[in-house]
Amino acid sequence: MVSLFQDYLGHNLLEVVARSTVFEDYVLTKEEVQQIVNTHFEPLPFGYKTRKELLNLYEAWVFVHLFSSSDIDITTFEDLHELISSGVTDKPQLEGHFRSDDFPVVISGSTYQPPSVSRTEAQADFNRTFNLLKETLSSDYIDRYVKVEQSLMFYIYLMRRQFFHDCNKRTSTLFVNLLFNHYDLNCFLWFPTLEELDKVLGRLKFCYENQGHIEDYEFVSYLKANWLVDFSE
């Protein structure tokens, strides 16, 4: 049986893929994405990296759409990152792997510095936080809106934590959508438009630099009001 999430993503797949490069400061049209998907690496008016990024994102969104495993864990998160980052980063040895303290991340235009710890510590941090979220998402006694809200709080956690050397925003966005699909939460989180990108990045940087529940909930409210499609409404 096709879920509401799968039906929505299936009908909007090309537009979703096109929007997914917005954090790289460009967005193609649905027609351009279709051309890239259909022709792969035949000569096109796009560079190698653009074509590879779009093909990766197309494959990653199909992975989210078709995901049918009985459980989601840290391996799912790493697999999704590998699909998205394959062949488009400057450190291929880190594609699909948590970064360590040897590879610090710098947030452009922000004073915030993501934690740099060993890979083992980073994985343990993820597992602790994600296991708590899974308890909430698996419960029959917690309202759906609370589960959606907590998933978006986890999205902020992933953005702030920057577990990978690159492609963190793309991986975080697809992963939270995979959660929406797997736990049948009847909603979909869009990437922002190019026109609204600066506003979103500004709000995100404010969350980075002012780490508090009020700031995080304000960003969650913004996401719900602007970029979340709720199929139950």
Task: Place the predicted regions along the sequence by residue.
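FIC/Doc superfamily catalytic core
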Residues: M1-E233
